[in-house]
Amino acid sequence: MKTTNVKAFGTHAADAPLNEMTIDRREVTAKDIEIEILYCGVCHSDLHTARNDWGFTVYPSVPGHEIVGRVTKIGSEVTKLKVGDIAGVGCLVDSCQTCESCKKDLEQYCLTGWTGTYGGVDKHLGGPTLGGYSEKIVVDEHFVLKVPSNLNLAAVAPLLCAGITTWSPLRHWKVGKGSKVAVVGLGGLGHMAIKLAKGLGAEVTLFSRTPGKEKDALALG
């Protein structure tokens, strides 16, 4: 398969800092979208992975799964986006797309195993998948979201991990006007949970052991 060299920031060992490196990205196939990365959020799991805190990092590791960028190429069968559109990529870039879970749009429960944006097994090139701390990425259109261009694109990036992590249970439990939602902790996810739940019309209660969080919680609604 043809590839293109792109610049990235990654690490070759748990005790090494992030350094600039050159990585390969595949050329687009029929259902692929190539994205020029404009913004990539920093999730704490990026740090855990780079340091091999969980014990299963495959090096080289290029973190980043909160990706926002501009579509630069599309495959012949792509229908969701066009060149020039703003696109987002979250934590997954592949799955079998044929099992019961995938057919229900629950690819995170893929019965044969989903592929993470980084640290997974690259089915096209072999080796580990390499994430968004890079100039470009190529992803199957099924795992790409169209992002409205009028949004603050830097602020959109964290929604692709922390945002969807809190949005998913709110949607699953059909939270809306009259619902009551409890949020434990006011960190990166907690503040999003409060804003999203309030936006859906719920009554929200925050549980925190830190008195200093009260002012922030009230400011969030």
What function would you assign to each model-found segment?
Residues 45-51:
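Cytochrome P450 core scaffold surrounding the K-helix E-X-X-R motif
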Residues 135, 142, 149-221:
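Mid-domain Rossmann-like dinucleotide-binding core that forms the NAD(H)/NADP(H) cofactor-binding site
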Residues 43, 91-142:
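Cysteine-cluster motifs in flexible loop/terminal segments that predominantly coordinate metals
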Residues 13, 38-40, 186, 209:
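Cofactor-binding loop segments of dinucleotide-utilizing enzymes, especially the Rossmann-like FAD-
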